Amino acid sequence: MFDGTTQAQDVAAAFQGEISGKTFVITGVSFGGLGAAVCEALAPYGPGHLIITGRDIQRPQEVAKALIAQYPDLQISVIQMDLALPKSVENAAQEIKKVASRVHVLVNNAGVMCIPDRTLTEKGIEAHLAINYVGHFLLTKLLAEQMSSTDSSPVQGRVINVSSSAHTVSPFRFGDPHFIGSSDLLPDEEPSREACKAFGIPWETSYSPLVAYAQSKTAVILHAKAISSGVLRDGITAFSVNPGGKWNPTILYVLCHC
């Protein structure tokens, strides 16, 4: 029975037969983060292949080195990917396809939180939205063929989008996703006054670091729902998950800067 005290290792142990021999792609892997924790939970149970990514390739390489030291037979590949850059995502997808003909589980974990000043990528996309959602949207689309079930490989691929309780702060701002001008927002696209109060942030429709982060987490929830409805491809199931609280570098950054 799982409850609020359940750890990742508990779930992995209970479903180890579903891990053995499977290929997992996990984005945003570094020591102290959720990505590394996922790897550590999976590694004891014989995954067929762990493919891990990071913007700074040294970080997932360090995790891979530690895992191999503990599990010498573990097959693990490390790929550089910057989710803010579509070309980097495309290159990473090609590298993944070279080392794995089938992807059973894609964990869209990488993310940023509470960038103090409104920042746009080279494509003009607000940074939280670009990295937390758009980059993962593209990666998922590019790997769809590798994840969909076939007659020879009937197991449905699974997409796991890491969300957050912060999604309650903001719906998706269809009228102004990049915080250019809030005059185009409809009332039901505005931040939640109640949630802003609960999180201890001022209510405003202009750029707010936590509101921008929250919008991106709403987006990944909607993304998972759309995938499960068959929009992307038949034979793929998607989930959005709230991982709960964890002390990690992102949280420490928020405490120091937001």
Curated annotation (Swiss-Prot):
The active site is at 163 (proton donor). PANTHER family: NAD(P)-BINDING ROSSMANN-FOLD SUPERFAMILY PROTEIN, RETINOL DEHYDROGENASE. It comes from the Eukaryota. The keyword Transport does not apply. Its EC number is 1.1.1.-. GO terms for molecular function: oxidoreductase activity. It is an enzyme of class 1 (oxidoreductase). Gene3D superfamilies: NAD(P)-binding Rossmann-like Domain. Belongs to the short-chain dehydrogenases/reductases (SDR) family. NADP(+) binds at residues 34, 59, 82, 109, 141, 193. The keyword NADP applies. Pathway: Secondary metabolite biosynthesis. It comes from Fusarium equiseti. This is Oxidoreductase fscI. Oxidoreductase; part of the fragmented gene cluster that mediates the biosynthesis of fusarochromene, a tryptophan-derived metabolite closely related to a group of mycotoxins including fusarochromanone. Within the pathway, fscI catalyzes the formation of the chromene ring from the prenyl moity added by the prenyltransferase fscG. The first step of the pathway is the epimerization of L-tryptophan to D-tryptophan in the presence of the NRPS-like tryptophan epimerase fscC. D-tryptophan is subsequently hydroxylated by the tryptophan 6-hydroxylase fscE to yield 6-hydroxytryptophan. Keywords: NADP, Oxidoreductase. Pfam families: adh_short (PF00106).
